[in-house]
A protein has these predicted regions:
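Bacterial N-terminal signal peptides
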Residues: 1-6
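Noncatalytic, solvent-exposed loop/strand surfaces
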Residues: 8-494
Length: 494
């Protein structure tokens, strides 16, 4: 089964059906012929654009002629449903027109459970005719990639009730609504506690779905309501049943929430799942080889543990709330698994923590407690960092929250150059076609040469802030601001 899954991904090499590279999470694409410049006013190199409403923090995925991306319901696409919903849009890759949407209303009762007005933050993962997503209500859903166009497939048949608040009457399901195959509510399935916004990118390995649980603090930002909830979980792909979870008891050490999706790779013939914990520790577990929906929930076997900030406090971490000088570290980005090494960013929480972070390079072949032995190098940044690295041709590219793009030697951690873009980065870099692409929250999008010799190729100012990661697929570059998705293609438009 795993081999078949790998072949499927290889056969769709031009698509981008997962956020980041397959399993590795590396923000690198093999696409060529991508635009170096574009003009949003004249339409030069702009194939199409699509409105996302507002607060669209997620990044797109592209598969089987469709583009899937998170949006909100600020400008309702279905006039029957005007509630505050997070929305997953399925657009036609050729022209950006709407095929279907999955609208999910807020949890309600406490804004900190499901922050109002933000878009669907999680990027789906597509395999075959199925898409897997963590919704804003912390539900893992399996979706029919064709929506309702081929009928309402079960076993889940309550889409009409699911798309509206619980105190409203169900809507009739139409051809432009999403089709949920199955749904697993993590609040009941693993007894976790939601915080702010659900953020995950599901990793598929054969019959298994790996994702971070989302467990976090309550609205006081000082109490962990569910300290025993797992941080990393595994679901059966066919049924949605939880089949495994970590046993690290990370809960009491959570400073904010569990937002970092896992990565996967092999070293010395051993397949590892690598997870950046909300406690600032990077963990590696053996990948599951035998677990079914009928079995009791397994505990993942830890292979190694690397504390990215060993001198930081590990107990009573809430006492450091709003302390910008000292406190615990948290991992808020995906680890990248390349050539037997793990590259991961770690540091103070962007909202409440110390203004300090690092890019770590870890030897993935180690075992046990490897905090002292596993570090290959460490690159300090005197600010926050929530970005996932891009590792390409011996170089690592990373953005930070002070508005810098960094180019670093992948073997030694030596800095080659930095580029100041002028506004903070929440998204990651994309390396493709010999270029480094990155968009900032001050609306500027920069294009640099992917080289140890710094060369700025261009800067384009967008109409709205960018908090996502650019994506390349099928000869196009996709960039979304908080309001609009742009499909860019060389020689398109005027």
């Amino acid at each position: 089964m795993a081999a078949m899954t790998g072949l499927f991904w290889q056969s769709q090499a031009e698509d981008r059906p997962q956020w980041g590279g397959f399993h590795t999470r590396n923000m690198v694409s093999t696409e060529t012929g991508l635009p170096t410049g574009f003009d949003l006013e004249t339409g030069k190199n702009v194939k199409w654009s699509a409105s996302l409403g507002g607060n669209a923090y997620g990044s797109p995925v592209i598969a089987s002629g469709k583009v899937l991306i998170g949006a909100n319901n600020e400008s309702p696409r279905d006039p029957r449903n005007t509630a505050d919903c997070a929305v997953l849009l399925c657009l036609d890759e050729s022209d950006g027109s709407l095929i279907w949407q999955l609208a999910v209303p807020r949890i309600g009762g406490d804004d900190y459970l499901d922050w109002p007005l933000i878009g669907m933050c999680s990027a789906p993962t597509v395999e075959g005719r199925r898409a897997y997503l963590l919704t804003n209500r912390f539900e893992v859903v399996c979706l029919d990639l064709d929506g309702q166009s081929n009928g309402n497939d079960g076993p889940f048949m309550e889409e009409g009730a699911h798309m509206v608040p619980s105190d409203e009457a169900p809507l009739d399901v139409t051809a432009t609504d999403g089709d949920i195959i199955w749904l697993t509510d993590l609040r009941s399935a693993v007894d976790m506690y939601p915080h702010d916004g659900a953020h995950a990118s599901i990793l598929i390995d054969g019959p298994y779905l790996y994702l971070n649980s989302g467990n976090g603090v309550d609205n006081t930002h000082k109490v962990i309501r569910k300290p025993e909830a797992p941080s990393l979980i595994v679901l059966d792909k066919e049924t949605g049943k939880v089949v495994a979870q970590d046993g690290e008891l990370i809960g009491p050490r959570i400073f904010h929430a569990t937002w970092a999706p896992p990565a996967m790779g092999e070293v010395d013939g051993r397949k590892l799942v690598v997870f950046g914990g909300p406690d600032g520790v990077c963990y590696a577990f053996d990948a599951l080889s035998s677990a079914t929906a009928a079995d009791p929930i397994q505990t993942l076997t830890r292979v190694w543990r690397f504390d990215c900030d060993p001198t930081a406090p590990k107990e009573n971490v809430s006492s450091f709330l709003k302390n910008r000088k000292e406190g615990p570290s948290i991992i808020e980005s995906m680890p990248v698994f390349v050539n037997g090494r793990v590259y991961v960013t770690v540091g103070g929480d962007i909202w409440w923590g110390k203004k300090q972070s690092w890019l770590k390079c870890i030897d993935a072949a180690k075992t046990g407690e490897i905090t002292a032995s596993g570090e290959i190098w460490s690159y300090p940044m005197e600010t926050h960092c929530v970005a996932t690295p891009a590792v390409s041709n011996g170089l690592v590219f990373i953005t930070d929250c002070e508005g810098f793009v960094h180019c670093i030697d992948a073997d030694t951690g030596e800095a080659y150059w930095t580029h100041e873009a002028g506004g903070e980065f929440w998204g990651s870099t994309l390396v493709a076609d010999g270029k480094v692409y990155a968009g900032s929250r001050n609306k500027d999008f920069c294009i640099l040469r992917a080289s140890k010799d710094k060369e700025l190729l261009g800067t384009v100012t967008f109409p709205a802030p960018i908090a996502s990661t650019p994506v390349a697929a099928n000869g196009r570059l996709y960039i979304n601001t908080l309001e609009t998705l742009y499909a860019l293609e060389e020689s398109s438009g005027k």
